[in-house]
Amino acid sequence: MKRIDFTLYAITDRSFIKGMDIAEAVEIAIKNGVTVVQLREKDISSREFYEIALKVKEVTRKYNVPLIINDRVDIALAVDAEGVHVGPDDLPVGVVRRILGPDKIVGGSAYSVEEALKAEKEGADYIGAGSVFAQPVKPEAEVIGIEGVRKIKEAVNIPVVAIGGVNKTNAYEVILHSGVDGISAIAGIFDGDIEANTKDMLREIRRAFKERGK
């Protein structure tokens, strides 16, 4: 797997995207600093997901940004995405790794050190750790706080991105005190002014990285 810049990892949710299609929203986010894109669209048909993924892949290829597909290994293979991200209710990381082979990116969600270590052992390339804070997108998600994310980061030897309720107002504190490699955001990027959200969050992330000496 090539080295990935996880600084600002955008996850799509069409419920936040108004007046444009997902590919257009993704392009705005990338132009303003997003370094990884995860296509995460629930409650749509496989055909619709595939067609959206094709359009988004055109955009990510244009800017040489990795495209990760949430859960759907078949869609990832169909559009030649760079990888797949799986959560606790999806296929196990080890199974996804076996299907995709050694060259694709496989990410796993973790709410605890034990889950993170298991994902790493099964072949995950990175961990999505959280939920850092309560979040509107997944209100049922377990909140582990900045300290919980820090423990996960310290336990594994692969990159960790913090996810869950992180936005431009708290990204600085999350990066500074958890030691993670980047921030993953849904509403923090796509809810409202995508350009401003992305620029503001990237500025806060870089400010924290600078203070950390990264």
From Swiss-Prot:
The keyword Ribonucleoprotein does not apply. 4-amino-2-methyl-5-(diphosphooxymethyl)pyrimidine binds at residues 38-42, 70, 109, 138. Pathway: Cofactor biosynthesis; thiamine diphosphate biosynthesis; thiamine phosphate from 4-amino-2-methyl-5-diphosphomethylpyrimidine and 4-methyl-5-(2-phosphoethyl)-thiazole: step 1/1. Coiled coil: none annotated. One of its GO terms (molecular function) is magnesium ion binding. InterPro entries: Aldolase_TIM, ThiamineP_synth_sf, ThiamineP_synth_TenI, TMP_synthase. Mg(2+) binds at residues 71, 90. It holds the Pfam family TMP-TENI. 2-[(2R,5Z)-2-carboxy-4-methylthiazol-5(2H)-ylidene]ethyl phosphate binds at residue 165. GO terms for biological process: thiamine biosynthetic process; thiamine diphosphate biosynthetic process. GO terms for cellular component: cytoplasm. It catalyses: 2-[(2R,5Z)-2-carboxy-4-methylthiazol-5(2H)-ylidene]ethyl phosphate + 4-amino-2-methyl-5-(diphosphooxymethyl)pyrimidine + 2 H(+) = thiamine phosphate + CO2 + diphosphate; 2-(2-carboxy-4-methylthiazol-5-yl)ethyl phosphate + 4-amino-2-methyl-5-(diphosphooxymethyl)pyrimidine + 2 H(+) = thiamine phosphate + CO2 + diphosphate; 4-methyl-5-(2-phosphooxyethyl)-thiazole + 4-amino-2-methyl-5-(diphosphooxymethyl)pyrimidine + H(+) = thiamine phosphate + diphosphate. Its EC number is 2.5.1.3. Keywords: Magnesium, Metal-binding, Thiamine biosynthesis, Transferase. Its cofactor is Mg(2+). Binds 1 Mg(2+) ion per subunit. Condenses 4-methyl-5-(beta-hydroxyethyl)thiazole monophosphate (THZ-P) and 2-methyl-4-amino-5-hydroxymethyl pyrimidine pyrophosphate (HMP-PP) to form thiamine monophosphate (TMP). Belongs to the thiamine-phosphate synthase family. This is Thiamine-phosphate synthase. It comes from Caldanaerobacter subterraneus subsp. tengcongensis (strain DSM 15242 / JCM 11007 / NBRC 100824 / MB4) (Thermoanaerobacter tengcongensis).
